[in-house]
A protein has these predicted regions:
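Fold-core signature of tandem repeat domains
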Residues: 7-12, 18-20, 24-29, 46-48, ...
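Extracellular beta-solenoid/beta-roll
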Residues: 9, 195, 267-270, 338-345, ...
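Intrinsically disordered, low-complexity Ser/Thr- and acidic-rich flexible linkers and loops
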Residues: 34-40, 137-145, 876-894
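C-terminal low-complexity, acidic/polar tails when present
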Residues: 459, 466, 483-485, 491, ...
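Short secondary-structure subsegments characteristic of cysteine-rich extracellular domains
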Residues: 595-613, 706-726, 852-859
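Outer membrane beta-barrel translocator domains of Type V secretion systems
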Residues: 647-832, 837, 843-845, 960-980
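Outer membrane beta-barrel transmembrane domains
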Residues: 770, 853-983
Length: 983
């Protein structure tokens, strides 16, 4: 476009180039940045030469508008990816994500920088009246890269709006900048006469700011190495000078805020006159509206005024004197600092030498009491008081949202009081002989704290104990409320208030409390226990409640079933109602081995007085109470009270333990057996016999333990017996055989109660030794068999509530005789008669509810019957083996084996059985003795086979059944296999 020529509209694409010496209007440029942004190698796009003019140009992605010296453009709009390289003049450029590079000699006026746009003002370039709307999206003082305005040259009258940022590089200068809320100016170079209207100015190391005016919500931050001069801070403005920063000739107007520490340098004037912070010394500083002064270790501050919104932070080892605290002023300190001055109410306070006196901590204030130090008469009005041990002396007051945080063990021997609003006591441990006083309508929350005080006086409002252990009595006024939440444990009495126990909370009521526990309304989902440190005579405890709302909470009551009067802790419902469901857990506080049968209504555990009512189901028994021979159950009576009564039936352990005598003696008798149960081979040689027997044994229900009968039972047994002959000889026409045997066995029997319900199981592991003597008259065949046996029993009785173990010894003697008659050559009939006498001694023991003593047990048995069986010659003879060497020791088929069979019916009579089992103590009425009888008659049928399978080996099998026909005699069935080897 030649000089004097005008071109309207047009588009430059695909490396097109337009050289403008005249005037170009409305061009669209989409090419020119082939070598990247602001690269001198680019040759495309629109070039405005000396004297050339371009108006209303649109530069899109990849497009370049280059304005050389002497050229001028106006109203250019540059989109993302497009750029304007300026060495001439540009007016009213709009950067919609595009970039403007203002080179030396270039002047940009009225540029508007929108989101993601960037204006770079290089050394020797000038930008005036720029509006910056981008660059700070990453937050205050964040490095966002190439967005916003970067000044290496000069920027004049820049306006920085929300999200806008101006970065003044070390060689750059910004003059008369206005920064609004949400925008900021970052200064590494020079900033002159900046006005902060809600925006921020950051003066970095090496940067300077002069003449800054900080208006409402504006904030000037002078960082380490930064310098600010002649700053004016108006009402609600803020000047922050970091450690190592410098601000001089500051004018701090009323309501303006200074934020600094004694590691900075600040001088100027405030409403009190000249002030300074120089070389670790601060003087005459005013703190308000967010102002703050940190007095560091070893530094000092004098004549500090702390008004509403101001904060004075005196670090450990720092000193602040002549401090004047106004209403709303904040003090941060610990007991290692030295602070003195006046409170907002004009009263003097001090901190020093490990002693803090008369502190008043307003909202936001914080004081830390170190271990070994003392704080006297501290008032916390919404502030934070942290005690890392130490002692609270005088009256410590918490009001209006105050927090007292404990770590370690803190001692209070005086008064901790809450007068207004809410307060929180949390963590650590508060001990001593002091008291806690709660007044006012608010709530005091004690959380995660161990609190041990002389008393807690709940005069008004609510006390909430959360996840804490509190050991003290709570003395309350009616209309107040006490809440136990989380895993709180309260050890102390309560009198009187409305109490709520959450499901994980526990209230332990001691018998040495200063007052009796009385509660108005009790909402109960936790646990309540009566605790006692007394020894000697039992003294029942009482909890009195007007209204009880049970929410599956538990109350543990001590009961003395062995006492006729004054025998239980009580819950008293006084004039109100008991609703919901409360579980009563009963603790036997007496001799667990002793229990009396209750009389009348029973043992009272819930008493309804003054017209009180209790819902059906308001109380349930949480556990079985057993004492002596009795179970005790909870019952509601017509008077609305609740009682424990001994049940008519004995507890399940009575028949269970009584059956142990019978079970052990049954086993001994079965093991001993009789001669007809032993497999033998006539001859001159001794033999060894191995027998394995198992079976079922039990007793029918013949009235049960209440009628003196053996309890109903059913179970199994098994044993292995090894016996061997020691002597075989002939004496005066008689064959004499003597030997010994040993056995190991086990029995397991399920026992039933008198009502047919399961009582439990008795298991017995037994080991036995015995001897026998057998005499046979050779001429007549008359024989006699004598057996003596001893057994060690290890027994365990298991019920739903007990595992009871006992050991003992059983003995047995047996005399049996028989005379065989030959009916035919191979058939024999043998009448038999047997007498058995046995005894048992079991050790005494004790279960969870009583002692158990066993008297000596004994029984006598007579068996009469006969044996009918074959009587073949048991000589082994010759076999049919094809090998001569085996014909004397082997058979080819079963039919060649010598076999005898037999059957044995009998009648067994048991008589003179004895065996006492007693439970309880010697106290009158508590001891119960049971003597289950085993007397009775049973029918027994046994049958067996024996076969000789080798010259010296005989195998026998046997099965039998016993049926009780009268009394409590045993019944069952059995099976046995025997291996007999002669040698």
């Amino acid at each position: 476009v030649q000089a004097g020529e005008t071109v309207n509209d047009g588009t430059l694409t695909n490396h097109d180039n337009q050289i403008v010496l005249g005037t170009a209007n409305g061009m669209t440029i989409s090419t020119g940045l082939e070598y990247g942004p602001d690269n001198e190698a680019n040759t495309g796009g629109q070039w405005i030469q000396n004297g050339g003019i371009a108006n209303n140009t649109t530069v899109t992605g990849g497009g370049l508008q280059r304005v050389n010296a002497g050229g001028s453009v106006s109203d250019t709009v540059i989109s993302a990816g497009g750029g304007q390289s300026l060495q001439g003049q540009a007016v009213n450029t709009t950067l919609n994500g595009g970039e403007q590079w203002v080179h030396e000699g270039g002047i940009a006026t009225g540029t508007v920088i929108n989101e993601k746009g960037w204006q770079a003002i290089k050394s020797g370039a000038v930008a005036t009246d720029t509006v910056v709307n981008t660059g700070a999206e990453g937050g205050p003082d964040a490095e966002n890269g190439d967005t916003g305005q970067t000044v290496y040259g000069d920027a004049v009258r820049t306006t920085i709006n929300k999200n806008g940022r101006q970065i003044v590089a070390a060689e750059g200068t910004a003059n008369t900048t206005g920064v609004y809320a949400g925008g900021d100016q970052t200064v590494h170079g020079h900033a002159l006469d900046t006005t902060l209207n809600g925006g921020y100015q950051y003066v970095h190391n090496g940067g300077t700011a002069s003449g800054t005016v900080v208006n409402s919500d504006g904030w000037q931050i002078v960082k380490n190495g930064g310098v600010a001069g002649n700053t004016t801070v108006n009402q609600k403005g803020r000047l922050q000078v970091d450690a190592g920063g410098t601000a001089t000739n500051v004018t701090l107007k009323q309501g303006g805020a200074l934020v600094t520490s004694t590691a900075a340098t600040v001088t100027g004037i405030n409403r009190l006159g000249a002030f300074s912070v120089v070389e670790g010394k601060a003087d005459n500083v005013v703190l308000e509206n967010g102002g703050r002064l940190d007095v560091l270790t070893g530094h000092t501050a004098t004549n500090t005024r702390v008004d509403d919104g101001g904060t004075l932070d005196v670090r450990n080892g720092g000193t602040a004197t002549t401090v004047s605290m106004g209403n709303g002023g904040v003090l941060l300190a610990d007991s290692g600092a030295a602070v003195s001055g006046t409170r907002s109410d004009g009263k003097a306070f001090s901190i020093g030498g490990g002693q803090a006196d008369a502190l008043m901590l307003e909202k936001g204030s914080s004081f830390t009491l170190n271990a070994g130090d003392t704080a006297t008469d501290t008032t916390v009005n919404g502030g934070l008081f942290t005690a890392r041990g130490g002692t609270l002396a005088g009256t410590t007051t918490l009001n209006n949202g105050a927090i007292l945080t404990l770590s370690g063990k803190t001692v209070n021997n005086d008064t901790l009081t809450i007068r207004e609003g809410d307060a929180l006591l949390q963590g650590g441990s508060l001990t001593g002989n002091g008291s806690v006083e709660k007044s006012g309508s608010g709530t005091l929350t004690v959380s995660n704290t161990t609190l041990t005080q002389k008393a807690v006086n709940l005069n008004e409002g609510t006390l909430t104990l959360n996840d804490s252990t509190v050991t003290t009595d709570v003395i309350a006024q009616r209309g107040t409320a006490l809440k136990l939440t989380g895993s709180t444990v309260l050890n102390g009495a309560i009198d009187p208030t409305n109490v709520t126990l959450a499901s994980g909370a526990t209230w332990n009521i001691p018998d040495n409390a200063t007052v009796q526990s009385v509660v108005d309304d009790l909402s109960h989902a936790g646990q309540i226990h009566f605790t006692s440190t007394r020894t000697g005579k039992f003294v029942p405890a009482t909890l009195k409640v007007k209204n009880l709302n049970g929410q599956n909470g538990t109350i543990s009551l001590h009961v003395r079933p062995d006492m006729a009067q004054n025998n239980a802790d009580r819950l008293v419902i006084d004039g109100g109602r008991a609703t919901g469901k409360t579980i009563l857990n009963l603790v036997n506080a007496g001799n667990s081995a002793s229990g009396l049968a209750t009389s009348g209504k029973g043992i009272q555990v819930v008493e309804a007085i003054n017209g009180a009512t209790t819902e059906e189901g308001a109380f349930i028994q949480g556990n079985k109470l057993q004492a002596g021979a009795f179970n005790y159950s909870l019952n509601r009576d017509s008077d609305e009270s609740w009682y424990l009564r001994s049940e008519n039936a004995y507890r399940a352990e009575v028949p269970l333990y009584a059956s142990m005598l019978t079970q052990a003696m049954d086993y001994d008798r079965i093991l001993a057996g009789s001669r007809s149960h032993q497999t033998g081979v006539s001859g001159e040689n001794n033999s060894v016999r191995l027998s394995i027997q198992g079976g079922h044994l039990g007793h029918d229900n013949n009235g049960g333990i209440a009628r003196g009968a053996t309890p109903e039972s059913s179970g199994s047994y098994g044993f292995v017996r090894l016996e061997g002959d020691l002597l075989r000889t002939e004496v005066a026409g008689m064959s004499v055989t003597a030997g010994v045997y040993g056995a190991a066995g086990h029995s397991s029997v399920d026992v039933k109660d008198d009502d047919g319900s399961r009582a439990g199981t008795v298991r017995d592991d037994a080991g036995s030794l015995g001897g026998y003597l057998n005499l046979i008259h050779n001429a007549s065949g008359l024989w006699a068999d004598i057996v003596a046996q001893g057994t060690r029993h290890s027994m365990k009785a298991s019920s739903d509530n007990n595992d009871f173990r006992v050991r003992g010894w059983g003995w047995l003697g047996s005399l049996e005789t028989g005379l065989p008659f030959s009916i035919t050559d191979n058939l024999m009939l043998e009448p038999q008669l047997q007498y058995t006498w046995q005894g048992l001694s079991l050790d005494d023991g004790q279960d969870n509810a009583s002692y158990v003593k066993f008297g000596h047990g004994s029984a006598q048995h007579v068996r009469a019957g006969f044996r009918l069986g074959s009587h073949h010659d048991m000589n082994f003879g010759k076999g049919t083996s094809s090998r001569d060497t085996l014909r004397g020791s082997a058979k080819h088929s079963v039919r060649e084996l010598p076999v005898n069979w037999w059957v044995q019916p009998s009648v067994i009579r048991t008589f003179s059985s004895r065996g006492d089992m007693s439970m309880g103590t010697a106290a009158a009425g508590s001891n119960m003795t049971f003597s289950p009888s085993q007397n009775g008659t049973s029918l027994d049928l046994q049958a067996g086979l024996e076969a000789r399978v080798r010259e010296n080996i005989t195998l026998g099998v046997q099965a039998g059944y016993v049926h009780s026909v009268s009394g409590s005699s045993a019944e069952g069935y059995n099976g046995q296999a025997t291996l007999n080897v002669t040698f």
